[in-house]
Amino acid sequence: EKAKKKNYIFNLKSADNNQASLLRSGLLLAGANSTLVNTTSNSEDGILTALEIANMNLSHLNLVVLSACDTGLGELTYDGVSGIQKGFKKAGAKSMLITLGKVDDKATQILMTFFYKNLCAGMNKHEALNNAQNSLRKYNNQIYSDPKYWAKFILVDALE
């Protein structure tokens, strides 16, 4: 119930001033397969680029979660890293949870479940992530205690 009152976007699978680098990052949506094999002829290609995102008004979003692999990576430009996260930032998203590398699907699913439960319980974003990471480390006889399972998730601009 509490989560319904928040303005969040969650991305479970994904794929600046420099427009070219914003065109090289994006989210693959329905229809992207056809575009990638050149079998589509409509204007909706199923690829939402960081440039398209940057041109949206997302200033109402408190948190964007990009929990797929490498969502915090991008091209290094004079004003920072330019990638999908830069598109959301330019669009006005107030904060993001991103990843800094390859992530394990099962561990990510468990971590995100803990994270969302913590948010719904009233924790702020930092507390929710920290608690979720600690819970994942202890989960099921500590099978996810290695930092490769939990340390690649970071919050950006999540000042509270």
Show which residues each predicted segment covers.
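Catalytic cores of enzymes
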Residues: 1-160
